[in-house]
Amino acid sequence: MGLLRLLVLAVLASEPRAAGGAETVGNSSEGLLEFSVGKFRYFTLKRPSPEEAILRHISSNVTFLIFQIHSQYQNTTISFSETLLPNASGTGTDKGLVFILRPEQSMCTWHLATLDAKPVQNVAIPLSYSERDPIPGGCNLEFDLDIDPNIYLEYNFFETTIKFAPANLGYARGADPPPCDIQTGQGSRWRLQYDVYQYFLPENDLTEEALLTHLQRMAEVPQVKASAVKVVTLTANDKTSVSFSSLRGQGVIYNVIVRDPFLNTSAAYVPAHTYTCSFVTTEGNCSSLGRVSSKVFFTLFALLGLFICFFGHRFWKTELFFMGFIFVGFFFYILITRLTLLTYDVLLALTAVAGSVGGVFLAAVWWRFGVLAPCLLCVGLVLGFLVSSVTFFTPLGNLKLFRDDAIFWVTFSCIAVVIPLVFTGCLRILNILSCGLVGSYSVVLAIHSYLYTSLSYITLNVLKRALHVDFRGAFLNVPFQTNDFIILAVWGMLAVSGITFQIRRERGRPFFPPHPYKLWKRERERRVTNILDPSHHIPPLRERLRGRLAQIKELFRKEQPAGERTPLLL
């Protein structure tokens, strides 16, 4: 058996190797995959057929290797031996192992398998490092592997958290590893720094091909620095855990580069990816991101918002209903979400009812009392909320200062309150601006229920902050790609068109309509006293309803036959 294995290796050595960044050839032999350092390779794993990966001709100046394998959503197992041991194997969609080379060793192997019933498409690569490079996960005390270069990823609706094990200093072949926690000076692993990178996949692209292609840009240090965005730099004293805002349906790849500033060397962990949704389960599936209830709710909301964008100031009571709906609905949703465990559809239905009540109440306040101050205060606060949300949607929202809830909410509230105060002397302009900006933004929210757009997170991030305490520590980075530029242009075009149209339309007209209740009362008194007014002779409502009912009854009454029906007298 050993002779047969050597014969197979001799045959492999005689075969030409493919050049380029990725090898896409099939198996070199049945159950055996040959790899080259720094070369990606595509292959398919099946459940009854495990594969063995082999790397030959390893240079003598290489002290350790990181072999990593990736798939889209199906789990793959990588191990040092055929027998799976907790400290020598890993299972997941993005997994890797560190192989510490022995003196004179020039070949190493790994075992690859999957327990999934369907074939799994994978891409894998072995990367080599020297004794001067730090070892990712070399001081692991939290996870199962002895040396763990993997990034562990957890997500929920609010945030996505990555965790990784601390690195250790590199060392020569055959030497003992440096101690992890005995010293804390510049001669120990405490001098290492960790750069956390984030890379966004193309929006609305959930294909396996796109993921495996873009993962190749996040495996090696130079490509990571050139392609991804550095979010934060951690020191050895910081906790090796970073949180990000969850972007449901948007593919994101994370990686960490550990740097040794003393030797000016670096190494990359194994990148991890997520869509913050599932490809397997029915609930929260990536292929059906928008719920039917969300689509119905935000579509109707957008239709009303589009009407308000162009005609809100002219139809004043309709605008008050719209603004009151937003004002009450937002706070009601936060309240019942934090106090109850109701499902999303029930929460949305109750929010719609509460918002409608709030809208009717605000319109009724204006109709009965005719006071502009509370109505325009509500309108101005809604506009201020949108302006404040846009402010924290910028990189300003990632400042460490605003991770404190008190500072964040005080600053947020001050910006929201300043907006109506600034426009105190020009209330009509305030109202028209609110109609144009808020009404047009409702269209953006409706688009998000059908198609992912980062602009929806302008307000969703604030909602998450109000609902989830731990969201305060999350980075709020979002992609800004072609779709977002198009939707931003649509939002701006609608807002500018609506504001311009209403300003031109209202030129020369009264700033606001007169008091509705006084008009109604004056009209009623006029009809009572003026007998020449035709409306004076209109019967009361009760008599008119009785008359209508009598006419309806006549339609169903059986028609009497004509002619004499009594017998003739003799």
Question: Language-model segments: what does each one mean?
Answer:
Residues 234-236, 241-244, 275-294, 301-305, ...:
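Juxtamembrane membrane-interface segments at transmembrane-helix boundaries in membrane proteins
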Residues 319-325, 346-351, 372-382, 403-409, ...:
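Cytoplasmic-side transmembrane-helix entry/capping segments in multi-pass membrane proteins
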Residues 289-365:
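Core alpha-helical transmembrane segments of integral membrane proteins
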Residues 2-18, 26-27, 39, 426-570:
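C-terminal transmembrane helix-loop-helix hairpin of multi-pass membrane proteins
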